[in-house]
Amino acid sequence: NSEDLDFISSVSKETLSFDLLDVIQSGPDDRLNQTSFTQPALLATSYLYYKKFLSITELTPNIMAGHSLGEYSALVASGSIDFKTALNLVYKRGLFMEKSDAGSMFAILNLNIETIYSICDEVRDTLDEIVAPANINSANQVVIAGSHKAAALASEKCKVAGANATGILKFG
């Protein structure tokens, strides 16, 4: 609803010194794709979905859980931290990611973890650059991360081995 959108807009202006809602709606895309903007945008979207859920159901969740960035959404939904605090934290999280060494992340789908580790080891030894599984999201989805070159090569080798691989993020 418009009250929730106004809330996102005003809190982001106050906390981050820019209107997050405007960035989400108007871009430009290259700005929205920077992790310092992407992370707050995802938090805001999750928050809005949660508020919508509460408005259309009579359910009151007893337990909240989140994974990675979703942990912040869960903390807000549970009342453990307020939206303003979470927004500031995820913005800083995105800034730190942008300042880290340059690299890429790829989601590797439908390939067993042993094969992924083996491919990452092989690429690391061949190129003498870092690439490794960074996040095991499920039995069917593992995120690998490393230098642009090593992560891209490992992703391609995973595809040859039968995986579906999707580039998800460049950082640094």
Predicted regions located by residue number:
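Alpha/beta catalytic cores of group-transfer enzymes, especially the acyltransferase/condensing modules
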Residues: 13-18, 27, 51, 78-172
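An amphipathic alpha-helix/helix-turn recognition signal
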Residues: 7, 41, 68-69, 81, ...
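Helix-rich "cap/lid" substructures immediately adjacent to catalytic or cofactor-binding pockets
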Residues: 1-65, 111, 144
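Gly/Ala-rich beta-loop-alpha elbow adjacent to hydrolase catalytic centers
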Residues: 46, 62-70, 74, 82
